Structures are given as structure tokens and as C-alpha cells.
Amino acid sequence: MSYLVTIIAFIIVFGVLVTVHEYGHMFFAKRAGIMCPEFAIGMGPKIFSFRKNETLYTIRLLPVGGYVRMAGDGLEEPPVEPGMNVKIKLNEENEITHIILDDHHKFQQIEAIEVKKCDFKDDLFIEGITAYDNERHHFKIARKSFFVENGSLVQIAPRDRQFAHKKPWPKFLTLFAGPLFNFILALVLFIGLAYYQGTPTSTVEQVADKYPAQQAGLQKGDKIVQIGKYKISEFDDVDKALDKVKDNKTTVKFERDGKTKSVELTPKKTERKLTKVSSETKYVLGFQPASERTLFKPIVYGFESFLKGSTLIFTAVVGMLASIFTGGFSFDMLNGPVGIYHNVDSVVKAGIISLIGYTALLSVNLGIMNLIPIPALDGGRILFVIYEAIFRKPVNKKAETTIIAIGAIFMVVIMILVTWNDIRRYFL
């Protein structure tokens, strides 16, 4: 049963993170007028799909990512060229609404035509010899029209609906929106947790066994007002003061029953693991703070938690990238789907609150990792847009696509190595 719970939790966490990320791309793409033929969660064979307006929404078998397919985002060429024989369906204005490429269709009242000239981006037309009269005709293509192949519809995208022909600013927003929506999701989750749990205060709720707070006699209800020379008004002040005092003997002042008292104690040094190869040193008194529920404090605390988590993850990512050049890199620094599954298994056992917190941190991590300037990632593609904005011309499309393809192959190789490393460490 525990395996089933972990699998369900993993699918939900993965699905939420990828859906939010890809929806960010699609939201800004559609606002910019870019056609999005497909919105996919997962990779590989399609297991479920439905169409809404011009977008096909699909869920695919392998939980290793997702994508939004945008018109003009690659070197794809129209499937029709001069010399081909196709069938066309016309509307009442004698405009082409469907270009049928095979016999796997149910359309009636269609015309067969041998294509002589065609344009699917600017002038939108097909010119050719029709079978019914063996004469040459010129047909305009309707603004909303489709290629039909194997029973599937692919909408034709005019030039002004293609990603490649948009200005740098909407391109940048479309690419940056994926990570941005991950950051927004994390922020919402942190704020939601703060509202649910309350914001921590400097009042003691519970002391931990064999920690300085218990050994010094602190009790439930004691309100800490000073550590060393540092005044305390909220729980964050406790952490800041202890970071400065470290594990040196210090005086702690607290209020109990309306009276101010003081004790001397030595904070305990602890190590908190951030990643598989890095950790953070913390100094603690060993007490659980009481929480309070107010209207606005959870928003502030949620922002602070988001900034702290983002800073820690950003520092870890920068350290990982630096280690590539300093010789300290290890695949243990990275987590693939198998590693994330293992982490979810551990977090689920701690409860739903821990799972939500982990999801928030994972969302931040996904956003930051996608901004790394590797061609296949959002960060690498943003570099191409910055180049276009500076030099007032886009990178050669063939060169850009080749570089992105190389980056994609690199990422696939890395993913395979990381996945094997995770399997070896966790299951072998």
C-alpha cells in the first residue's frame, strides 16, 4: 500500500509541476498570438487526449517532462509542396478549410488537386490542376484551416501566428513564463502552508530532549526576548541571533508569567543537508515555536520562506555548475525521476504538509534549473532571444535548431546517466 501511495503522490507532484510550467509557456504564447497545436504532459506514446479550440491536450506515458508545441518553433516544413496530389475541402466562400493528405478521413464533397504552387505562411493559397475539370485553379486558404493526416487535424499557422516571427519581447516572455509560473506556484504553496500552520513566534511551544533549551529550563509559554546582545521580536530574529552567536556560551532572556528572566546556555551546532553533496551549518536552542494565525503575517512569512528556499537552491545550482570546472562534479548532485520518486517516498511518510513543502522547493528547483543557459532549456533559448534583441536580427534558424538539437541530445544523455546513477544508489 505504501508503494501505491508513493506512486500516486509522485504522479501528482510531477503532474502539477510540469502542468504549471508548460501552462506558463502556453499562457504567454497565446497572449502573443502564437498558435499552440499541442500541450503535452509526459513524453512518449499518447495515452489520453482531447482537443479544445486549436490546441490538442495530451497525457503521455513517460513522466520525464512535458512540452508546448508552438507553431514556427523549429525547422518543420509544410507537408505539402508543388508536385503533390492532395484533396481539399472548400467552404461556402470557395476557400480551403482542410487539406487532406491520405485516405484516412471521413470528409465528403472534396476535390482532388495536383499542387503547382502553394504558400502556407504569407499569401495562404494553393494553385493547381483539379481532377474534375483538368484545369488550373487558384484557391485561397481560409484563416482557420487544417492539414488532415491519419485522421488527425493540424491547424495551419500563418506567419503572424508563428513563434519565430514574433518580436523579441513576446518571445522572451513566452520562454521565461515557464520558470516564472514555477516560482509563482512555490510562493503560493509557501503562503498556503503559512496560513494553514500559522507563522512561528518567539514563544516556546515545546522543548526537545537533551537540547540546550531543555537543559537550561525553558518551558512551554516562555517568550524569548533577547539572545546575547540581540533583541528578539519574532522567530526569524532567533535564527539570525544564533547565526551570530554560534556555539558560544550566551545569555538568553525570556518572559515567563509577566516577569523577565535569563539563563546561560550554549547553542547546539547542527548540519542540515541541502543537496547530496552540500550542507548548511545551523545553531539551535532546540525548541518548537508556538504559531499564531493573523491575516497578513503568513503572506510575509511565505515570501520569506520562498526567498530562503530560492537562495539555498540557487547557491547549490551555482556550486554544482562551478564544480564542473573545478573537478568536484558528481552525478550525486543531480536527481532524475527515480531520485525524485525516492525523495517523495521519504517525504510522504512525514505527512501531507511535508509533501507540499517539498513540492514548493521542487518547483523552485525546476524553475532555476530551466534557466541554466543550455540550448535545450529555457535559459539557453532566452540567450538566442537576447542576441536577437541586441543585434536586431534573429540567429540563423538552421544554426539555432542544430544547436538546440545538440543541447537536447546532451540533456537526454545526462538524464540517462542520472537515472542510472539513481537506480544504482537507491535500488541496487
Curated annotation (Swiss-Prot):
Its EC number is 3.4.24.-. PROSITE patterns: ZINC_PROTEASE (PS00142). It is found in: Cell membrane. GO terms for biological process: proteolysis. Belongs to the peptidase M50B family. It is a multi-pass membrane protein. One of its GO terms (molecular function) is metal ion binding. SUPFAM superfamilies: PDZ domain-like. The keyword Methyltransferase does not apply. The keyword Zinc applies. The chain crosses the membrane at residues 172-194, 309-331, 352-374, 401-420. It is an enzyme of class 3 (hydrolase). It comes from the Bacteria. Zn(2+) binds at residues 21, 25. Keywords: Cell membrane, Hydrolase, Membrane, Metal-binding, Metalloprotease, Protease, Transmembrane, Transmembrane helix, Zinc. One of its GO terms (cellular component) is plasma membrane. The active site is at residue 22. This is Putative zinc metalloprotease SAS1196. Its cofactor is Zn(2+). Residues 186-269 form the PDZ domain.
